[in-house]
């Protein structure tokens, strides 16, 4: 059975309906177990380099789970035990981009992934 890893592409107004803050994810796809995938998140409307950033995920029928956090300059990262050693969070402050490199995927990684600040 193949692993369906789904990414919901969205623009999230994080500070209310009037806000110009947006986080737009891309890169979701279907992958077989053991394969890799990289998710991207383009930020706009705020000083990206001034915020720690997060990835969270929601498995079908479940609540939100924290995946990983990266500090403002990318020098420190923290991971959920479920993804430690498999996923890598990184950022490109000059491009306002956040990334999640996912490897050794398993059926348990099937989820909608969201970036957040």
From Swiss-Prot:
The record's SUPFAM superfamilies line, in alphabetical order, gives:
Immunoglobulin
Query: Region Complementarity-determining-1: what ranges?
Result: 50-54
Q: Does the keyword Signal feature in the UniProt annotation?
A: yes
Where is the segment annotated Complementarity-determining-2? 69-85
Q: Which UniProt keywords apply?
A: Adaptive immunity, Disulfide bond, Immunity, Immunoglobulin, Signal
Its GO biological process annotations read:
adaptive immune response
Kindly list the residue ranges recorded as spanning the membrane: none
Which SMART domains does the record associate with it? IGv
- Pfam families attached here? V-set (PF07686)
Write down the PROSITE patterns for this protein, in alphabetical order: IG_LIKE
Report the record's disulfide bonds: 41-115
Q: Tell me the domain of life.
A: Eukaryota
InterPro entries (alphabetical): Ig-like_dom, Ig-like_dom_sf, Ig-like_fold, Ig_V-set, IgHV
A single GO CC term, please?
Answer: extracellular region
Q: Where is this region: Framework-2?
A: 55-68
Q: Indicate what this protein is called per its UniProt record.
A: Ig heavy chain V region C3
User: Whose protein is this, by species?
Assistant: Caiman crocodilus
What would be the name of the gene that encodes this protein? C3
């Amino acid at each position: 059975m193949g692993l369906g890893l789904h990414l919901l592409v969205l623009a999230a107004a994080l500070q209310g309906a009037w806000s110009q803050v947006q986080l737009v994810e891309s890169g979701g796809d279907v992958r077989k177990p053991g394969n890799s995938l990289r998710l991207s998140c383009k930020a706009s409307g705020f000083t990206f380099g001034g915020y720690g950033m997060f990835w969270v995920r929601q498995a079908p029928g479940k609540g939100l789970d924290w995946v990983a956090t990266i500090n403002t300059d990318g020098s420190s990262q923290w991971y959920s035990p479920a993804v430690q050693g498999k996923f890598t969070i990184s950022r490109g402050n000059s491009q306002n981009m956040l990334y999640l490199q996912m490897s050794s995927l398993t059926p348990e990684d099937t989820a909608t992934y969201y970036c957040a600040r």
